[in-house]
Amino acid sequence: NLIISETLKQYVYSFKNKKILSTKQNFGNISLISQMFQRCYLKESNTGAFFVNLINNKQGDYSRYIFFYINYLIENKKIEEAKKIAGQLEYINSTLLLSQSRSWIENGKFKEFNKIFSCNNHNDIVSEFLFLVSNLYSSQNDFENSNFYFNLSNYLNPNFTFNLSLIAENFYMNKEYIKVKEVL
């Protein structure tokens, strides 16, 4: 809970003061993700490097953040760079989110990215953090907390329907098949 509250304080500080809090606690990769999104929100020039460092981090699977990097590139009119990254994604070996990203790029539907997430929207950023927390709880089979944080995340950004797969998986793991069907 300390990690959650401190990270949320950092976000609020950044949103309110338009800068990153200089004295902050380090929570490892969660802090890297949070700094990346804060820099994206603040439109800092080194934001792209933060995305690349996270995506290439060997300490875990951060492929989800390829979507946010492509989104960032599109918001900043770097379409050719976004196309290059999307072109490296494989439909078969990628998540639904990344496969959809590639499809949108290939079909020139760049505005679709902004319909579900924007670095300019503080609700979207906090929603993604809460989704990360939900995912962490789910990986520990703590589905009650996972669902709680998922619902907060979904409230802040109901347009990010790709996240519904997590709640469906949580229901499935709890053998709540009727709820899985409702989500799908």
Identify the role of each PLM range.
Residues 1-184:
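Alpha-helical solenoid repeat scaffolds
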